Amino acid sequence: MNKVVLLCRPGFEKECAAEITDKAGKREIFGFARVKENAGYVIYECYQPEDGEKLISELPFSSLIFARQWFVVGELLQHLPPEDRITPIVGMLQGVVEKGGELRVEVADTNESKELMKFCRKFTVPLRAALRDAGVLTNYETPKRPVVHVFFIAPGCCYTGYSFAHNNSPFYMGIPRLKFPSDAPSRSTLKLEEALHVFIPEDEWDERLANGMYAVDLGACPGGWTYQLVKRNMWVYSVDNGPMAQSLMDTGQVTWLREDGFRYRPNRNNISWMVCDMVEKPAKVTALMAQWLVNGWCRETIFNLKLPMKKRYEEVSHNLAYLQAQLDEHGVNAQIQARQLYHDREEVTVHVRRLWAAVGGSRDER
């Protein structure tokens, strides 16, 4: 199987294609990307027949910015008979996947696919039963086995394949299903909530998002991101010239600092988190984030980079390379991840976790 399907935000197919071509090439897995504008997915076709599986095994999914999900597939199944779509799909998967741990019948995230998604939901139950009978799926769901994907691009037309549970998105279609809290000051709160789900393993939440931590929110008004930190019982310094929502101030956990986020300097030495969603040029935001991390002013940060209209992948790559270079130059070991989240628009979200430094900061992990 030499094709890899990558799901992405509609309108960002070129960025997704540029990224997978670049990162696959660096691992000497060569091929070309098939791109259809606003399709919500890209197909990377490897030149060597077994390189599809090699790519989804060797390249960490967490290193991809513009892909929401990926899986290796075979040839396109077309003209599935309406009276029996199941038999051809089972036939395609037999001998390819054995004892898969989960089935996902998916579509691209486009308006055109909404009707198709209704069919996928109904189709999943009988297909799952047939795949279990054929030995393609285990009799129970397990995260220890590959995930079987059936990806419909049109009625009666699908790709079939699989991904590895340890190197994919755990979410259906790569999208966490989050509900907007009615008491949140703005919808931007969902960006930070999704980022926490994507970047921080669930079993580490109690330690890394603990009660009583101190956090800073730069460019906080009206408080969408502060809301998430308050909900996790943190003490938050919200920095913005604009006012904060009164509901947040009433919690007693928020200190509003009427300052410019770029000029603010923390006066505590025990800040665990700094978050930032300011509308500013990516280079300026990245330089500020580097300053915070190099100086050890926080242990972890999540921030957004607003994207230009053109050369978006190149712009993000350039800024992440600058950030890495600054950390390296100052002897800071950190883990950097970036992703265009479902709730992001013309932007990407970056997470950096400072692990240790040659010159000790106050929030280093030893």
From Swiss-Prot:
- Can you tell which superkingdom this protein's organism belongs to? Bacteria
Q: Is Cytoplasm there in the keyword field?
A: yes
Q: Which Pfam families match?
A: FtsJ, RlmM_FDX, RLMM_N
**What does the UniProt entry say about where the protein is found?**
Cytoplasm
Q: GO terms for CC?
A: cytoplasm
Q: Does the keyword S-adenosyl-L-methionine apply?
A: yes
Q: Which UniProt keywords apply?
A: Cytoplasm, Methyltransferase, rRNA processing, S-adenosyl-L-methionine, Transferase
GO molecular function, a single term: S-adenosylmethionine-dependent methyltransferase activity
Annotated GO biological process:
methylation; rRNA processing
Q: Which InterPro entries does the UniProt entry name for this protein?
A: RlmM_FDX (IPR040739), RlmM_THUMP-like (IPR048646), RNA_MeTrfase_FtsJ_dom (IPR002877), rRNA_MeTrfase_M (IPR011224), SAM-dependent_MTases_sf (IPR029063)
Family, according to the entry, reads as follows: Belongs to the class I-like SAM-binding methyltransferase superfamily. RNA methyltransferase RlmE family. RlmM subfamily.
* Quaternary structure annotation from Swiss-Prot or TrEMBL: Monomer.
Describe the task this protein carries out: Catalyzes the 2'-O-methylation at nucleotide C2498 in 23S rRNA.
Q: What is this protein called?
A: Ribosomal RNA large subunit methyltransferase M
Gene encoding it? rlmM
